[in-house]
Design a protein with these regions (language model features):
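Conserved donor-binding/catalytic core segment of Leloir-type glycosyltransferases
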Residues: 28-29, 178, 200-218, 225-228, ...
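Donor nucleotide-sugar binding/catalytic pocket of nucleotide-sugar-dependent glycosyltransferases
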Residues: 149-189
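Nucleotide-activated donor-binding/catalytic signature segment of Leloir-type glycosyltransferases, i.e.
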Residues: 79-82, 250-272
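Short His-centered aromatic/hydrophobic patch
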Residues: 112-118, 137
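A short helix/loop element that forms part of the nucleotide-sugar donor recognition site in Leloir-type
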Residues: 11-16, 184-199
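N-terminal strand-loop element at the rim of the active site
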Residues: 25, 31-38, 44, 49-89, ...
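A short, well-ordered alpha-helix in the C-terminal region of glycosyltransferases
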Residues: 352-366
Length: 425
């Protein structure tokens, strides 16, 4: 069954192991799967900042890695100095690293935003002191390697329903949150961004803000570039704001498109530490996941991108679909670029854009940061109140450790070195 927000007293705490007193501030350790600036870590840090503002103690760790654009400046602006853990570690070594951080900060909860960290976090939280691990998976698919008894947070109803059917695991639904105050439309910032890139007032800026990665993102960006080429509209400009492992390939596609059109129709800006002016500059936004929600918060008309050519404009006709599936899709299209071009043609009408912008801004109010932080508080307290006894926790951790050892020994023979799977968007 789906976990609903329940009062802290809804489940009994074992009498020999008192959990946090209802209402007492919690100590929370947040774990980020890497250092690349992107939607998932930004959401995690925003939630951490909001929890801290509500009186809780929040610390952050992140897996160290070499990236084009680091999240560390954003973390520092949010009031955090993440502890960096080595990129390559076995599950047992990673669990020891996390446990040391939990001990140092007297953490009640370790909440990792990256499902591949779930095993290590679960092992780290086991022991005599009642502590809980929580895993958030905001990817667009369920994964098999999250421990079954570890509370799991998913971002769409479809994934939640699917995961609940897997051996009755505990699942919470929480869409990526939006900072409704910071992500409000600023017309002046948008004008400055447009001037910086040479976009005139009479041009139509189609803006994509997000990681330029091979995983999930590259396909949609290629279709967007081809759609601009096919339309050949002299006022249409495509601005791609972000960085990632597919950047050079997408830049090559942009160069090809610009030569074909005889103008600078497609521009890649690279990543920006503050991408909000890019949303403000958009006449039309393209995106998925958290980036799509931020576009709605900025009151921009939105076309949601996905896999296999999926593209759909957010509006009254599609709201039910996105409520169920999340801001993503994987419906195959025979002509992906042509399908996306048709969505853009509909949005060339200024009145249509204004109508959808107002609708999206009204709908996104449901995804505010404060509501997300309140939900996390309830989740943490409920899970801490429902922990098994010391013996049960240690047996679970021992079984999980044994399975992890067998799994990693098997994969080490095939050259696996402790690196993580695909990044969350």
């Amino acid at each position: 069954m789906t976990n609903q927000v329940a009062p802290p007293s809804a489940r009994a705490t074992p009498p020999d192991e008192p959990g946090p007193v209802p209402g007492r501030p919690l100590s929370v350790l947040l774990g980020l799967e890497g250092l690349a600036l992107g939607g998932c870590p930004i959401n995690a840090l925003d939630l951490g900042r909001t929890l801290r503002g509500r009186g809780h103690r929040v610390e952050v760790f992140a897996i160290d890695e070499q990236v084009r654009t680091s999240l560390l400046p954003y973390a520092e602006r949010s009031g955090f100095r993440p502890t960096l853990l080595p990129q390559r570690s076995s599950t047992h070594a990673r669990a020891r690293q996390i446990r040391r951080l939990m001990d140092a900060s007297s953490s009640d909860v370790v909440h990792v935003f990256g499902p591949w960290l779930g095993r290590a976090a679960t092992i780290a939280a086991a022991g005599r002191r009642p502590r809980s691990a929580v895993v958030t998976n905001w990817m667009m698919e369920n994964v098999p390697y999250v421990p079954r008894r570890t509370p799991l947070v998913l971002g769409t109803r479809r994934l939640r329903d699917e995961a609940e059917g897997i051996q009755g695991r505990k699942v919470w639904l929480m869409e990526p949150p939006v900072d409704l105050e910071a992500d409000a439309h600023d017309a002046a910032a948008g004008r400055r961004f447009r001037r910086e890139l040479g976009v005139t007032d009479d041009e139509i800026a189609v803006v994509v803000v997000g990681r330029v990665d091979a995983h999930l993102k590259e396909e949609g960006l290629r279709h967007a570039i081809e759609a601009v080429v096919r339309l050949g509209h002299p006022a249409l400009r495509l601005l791609v704001v972000g960085d990632g492992d597919a950047f050079d390939r997408i830049q090559s596609e942009a160069d090809r498109a610009n030569r074909q059109l005889g103008r600078r129709a497609v521009v890649l800006t690279g990543s920006r530490q503050d991408p909000r002016p890019a949303y403000d500059a958009a006449d039309i936004a393209l995106g998925m996941g958290g980036s799509a929600l931020r576009a709605l918060a900025h009151a921009r008309p939105l076309v949601v991108l996905g896999q296999h050519g999926f593209a759909a404009t957010y509006g009254p006709e599609t709201r039910a679909y996105f409520d169920e599936q999340g801001f993503f899709g994987d419906t195959s299209e025979a002509d992906p670029a042509g399908h996306l071009a048709a969505q853009l043609v509909d949005l060339l009408d200024p009145s249509r854009r204004a109508e959808l912008a107002a609708y999206g801004r009204a709908e996104v109010q449901r995804y505010g940061l404060r509501a997300g932080a309140v939900q996390l508080e309830a989740l943490y307290r409920e899970e801490l109140g429902a922990l098994p006894g010391v013996l049960g926790r240690e047996v679970d951790a021992a079984l999980l450790s044994a399975r992890a050892f067998v799994h990693e020994t098997r994969f080490a023979a095939r050259g696996w070195s402790g690196a993580r799977p695909a990044r969350q968007p």
